[in-house]
């Protein structure tokens, strides 16, 4: 997209690649108890099994869909107008918010009055911001603790279930072998959940709205849903739900425009980003964020200290509580769903980093450490934490308590500074919960595999099971350019142990700002890690997609293999590099083994022979061996023959 500001406002558009439906997929909606609860899912159509393999019907499978209206051909996409306000009616019906006459942050008012920003501003519908009425608390946690099941909670329950029960029923009615097929496709290995909800191997275990409410009330899950982001589709972050992933985007002082960041957001959610963090540190942070939020169907997170630092020209020592407070209100009124706040970086912990290999690597952590040292005072984030809670509960902004002292190398993993901060984050969690403010805890970082579980166990203990949100962790430091892999290994492990959301890492980590291709690579890598964790935990229905793809692979349904996978485009591209013809899409082999050495084709031949002989597959193999033994003796019982 052209970076020219005038072009942006006049002709801004979404990338065509981000709105095209995925192959053999369509957007479907499942309606809840009221007509305006319409939960999106992606339906993947499958071909029938070839006659030679049984000829049964393969019903569509349903997968979690984060792409919002962008992949719905019936939706009118205009990023200048933004997305429909999906939750507006639910928010209004609760009767506990008020519409403000205008912006109440000083900086927001200044930007709105500045003629230099006119061409950069979001041109769509300008709703006045909402805030809780005096004395009211509008957080999803508050409602949950009052015993209220909100529409958001019902929406989430439907979304997490992914129509598993309907899929199994459709298998049962697919033909004479339907019951057998349903049992096979619904089979799932028991998981090891490390104290999380024990669903076992029950693929049909249902996530109910009441279960969602209870998990939020306990603080074990959060629903990031600012009342000023009504465009968002409700989702949940907690270890008893599907593991989620976050994608980071954002401009810097040296690269990227507003248009490019909107493109990255729509691209990230196409491939499975459950939330997006705008980490912009360059020009026009306020305007960039407005465009992103108004066009985002997923929760948006930020690190407010980044923008506060820009307001004091990059001088950390000039930061004040008043500037930071105004920044929180500014962003809350725009609709940011969760704030990363590094309130655990206390003055007493800063000296503990002196002997580290890589010091303080968190931007937010280093900003607050510098402020503490410059003033030799306790962090104003820590000192004013209760006041921050008052702001959060007025808009339902969730805390993402930042790990400002996370290790930046495996050398520094699990050291005194990191664990001291984690203990403080646990204390702050208890304070936030007194205000019914939702909390998740950020985690490392760089941690070798043998130390990962200790991180998870300490977090569960000290933070009382508040959701854990980790960056990786990276399990080795030797692979610049491949840190999506070094971190994907750690992400799969810590997701299995109980982490609720994984922050993606792209191949550009430590090297540069990611482009769209890097964003996709990071997303797919982390979707894979999250799914592997769901399988290992034994999450209900986690294996359905694996079973469907494996069946398609065994039956040489190549198109279904591509389409059920996380990245149909890459799978098709790799296959077509060596077998590009359409005939290869129905062939009973690939270029790996060729037509004569395909193990799956050989297995099919054994099954066909068994069916012809009216014997079991084991007996068929035995008969085949006997025939070959007779042939061996008749030809002279020689191992080798001259040609």
Swiss-Prot record:
GO CC terms: cytosol
Assigned EC number: 4.1.99.17
The organism's place on the tree of life at top rank: Bacteria
Listed GO biological process terms: thiamine biosynthetic process; thiamine diphosphate biosynthetic process
Coiled-coil segments: none
Annotated metabolic or biological route of this protein: Cofactor biosynthesis; thiamine diphosphate biosynthesis
Binding annotation for Zn(2+): 446, 510
Residues noted as binding [4Fe-4S] cluster in the record, renumbered to the chain: 590, 593, 598
Cofactor: [4Fe-4S] cluster
Residues binding substrate: 248, 277, 306, 342, 362-364, 403-406, 442, 469
Keywords associated with the record: 4Fe-4S, Iron, Iron-sulfur, Lyase, Metal-binding, S-adenosyl-L-methionine, Thiamine biosynthesis, Zinc
Keyword Metal-binding: yes
Catalytic activity: 5-amino-1-(5-phospho-beta-D-ribosyl)imidazole + S-adenosyl-L-methionine = 4-amino-2-methyl-5-(phosphooxymethyl)pyrimidine + CO + 5'-deoxyadenosine + formate + L-methionine + 3 H(+)
Cofactor binding summary note: Binds 1 [4Fe-4S] cluster per subunit. The cluster is coordinated with 3 cysteines and an exchangeable S-adenosyl-L-methionine.
Gene Ontology molecular function: any one: 4 iron, 4 sulfur cluster binding
Subunit structure as annotated in this protein's UniProt entry: Homodimer.
Known function: Catalyzes the synthesis of the hydroxymethylpyrimidine phosphate (HMP-P) moiety of thiamine from aminoimidazole ribotide (AIR) in a radical S-adenosyl-L-methionine (SAM)-dependent reaction.
Family statement: Belongs to the ThiC family.
PANTHER family: PHOSPHOMETHYLPYRIMIDINE SYNTHASE, CHLOROPLASTIC (PTHR30557:SF1), THIAMINE BIOSYNTHESIS PROTEIN THIC (PTHR30557)
UniProt name for this protein: Phosphomethylpyrimidine synthase
Organism: Burkholderia orbicola (strain MC0-3)
């Amino acid at each position: 997209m052209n970076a020219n500001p005038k072009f942006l406002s006049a002709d801004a558009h979404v990338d065509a690649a981000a709105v095209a439906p995925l192959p053999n997929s369509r957007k479907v909606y499942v309606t809840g108890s009221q007509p305006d609860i319409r939960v999106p899912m992606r339906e993947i159509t499958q071909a029938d099994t070839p006659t030679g393999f049984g000829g049964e019907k393969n019903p569509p499978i349903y997968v979690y869909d984060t792409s919002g209206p962008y992949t719905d051909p019936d939706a009118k996409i205009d990023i200048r107008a933004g997305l429909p306000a999906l939750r507006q009616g639910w928010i209004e019906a609760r009767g506990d918010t008020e519409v403000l006459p205008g912006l109440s942050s000083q900086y927001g008012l200044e930007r709105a009055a500045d003629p230099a920003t006119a061409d950069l501003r979001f041109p769509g519908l300008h709703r006045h911001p909402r805030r809780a009425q005096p004395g009211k608390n509008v957080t999803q946690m508050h409602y949950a603790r009052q015993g209220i099941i909100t529409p958001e909670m019902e929406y989430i329950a439907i979304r997490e279930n992914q129509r598993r029960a309907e899929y199994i029923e459709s298998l049962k009615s697919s033909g004479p072998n339907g019951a057998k097929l349903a049992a096979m496709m619904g089979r799932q290995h028991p998981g090891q959940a490390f104290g999380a909800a024990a669903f076992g191997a029950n693929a049909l275990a249902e996530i109910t709205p009441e279960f969602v409410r209870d998990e939020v009330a306990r603080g074990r899950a959060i629903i990031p849903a600012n009342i000023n982001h009504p465009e968002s589709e409700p989702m949940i972050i907690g270890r008893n739900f599907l593991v989620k992933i976050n994608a980071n985007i954002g401009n810097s002082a040296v690269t990227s425009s507003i248009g490019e960041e909107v493109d990255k957001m729509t691209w990230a959610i196409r491939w499975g980003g459950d939330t997006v963090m705008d980490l912009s540190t360059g020009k026009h942070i306020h305007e960039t964020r407005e465009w992103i939020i108004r066009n985002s169907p997923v929760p948006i997170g930020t690190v407010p200290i980044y923008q506060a630092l820009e307001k004091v020209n990059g001088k950390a020592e000039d930061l004040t509580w008043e500037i930071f407070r105004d920044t929180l209100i500014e962003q809350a009124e725009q609709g940011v769903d969760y704030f990363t706040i590094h309130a655990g970086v206390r003055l007493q912990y800063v000296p503990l980093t002196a002997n580290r290999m890589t010091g303080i690597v968190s931007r937010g952590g280093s900003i607050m450490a510098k402020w503490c040292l410059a003033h030799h005072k306790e962090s104003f984030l820590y000192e004013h934490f209760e006041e921050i809670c008052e702001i959060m509960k007025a808009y339902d902004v969730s805390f993402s308590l930042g790990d400002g002292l996370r290790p930046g190398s495996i050398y520094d993993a699990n050291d005194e500074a990191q664990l001291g901060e984690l203990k403080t984050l646990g204390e702050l969690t208890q304070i936030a919960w007194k205000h019914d403010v939702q909390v998740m805890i950020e985690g490392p970082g760089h941690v070798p595999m043998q130390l990962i579980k200790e991180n998870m166990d300490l977090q569960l203990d000290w933070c009382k099971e508040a959701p854990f949100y980790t960056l990786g962790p990276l399990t080795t430091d030797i692979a610049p350019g491949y840190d999506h892999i070094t971190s994907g290994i750690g992400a799969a492990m810590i997701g299995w142990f109980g982490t609720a959301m994984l922050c993606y890492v792209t191949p550009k980590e430590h090297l540069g700002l990611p482009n769209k291709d890097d964003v996709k690579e990071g997303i797919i890598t982390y979707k894979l890690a999250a799914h592997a964790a769901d399988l290992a935990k034994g999450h209900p229905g986690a294996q359905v997609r694996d079973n469907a793809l494996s069946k398609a692979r065994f039956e040489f349904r190549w198109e279904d293999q591509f389409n059920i996978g996380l990245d149909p485009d890459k799978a098709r591209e790799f296959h077509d590099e060596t077998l590009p013809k359409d005939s290869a899409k129905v062939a009973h082999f690939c270029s790996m083994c060729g037509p004569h050495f395909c193990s799956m084709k050989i297995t099919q031949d054994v099954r066909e022979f068994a069916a012809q002989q009216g014997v079991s597959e084991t007996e068929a193999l035995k008969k085949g061996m006997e025939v070959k033994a007779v042939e061996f003796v008749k030809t002279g019982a020689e191992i080798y023959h001259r040609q």
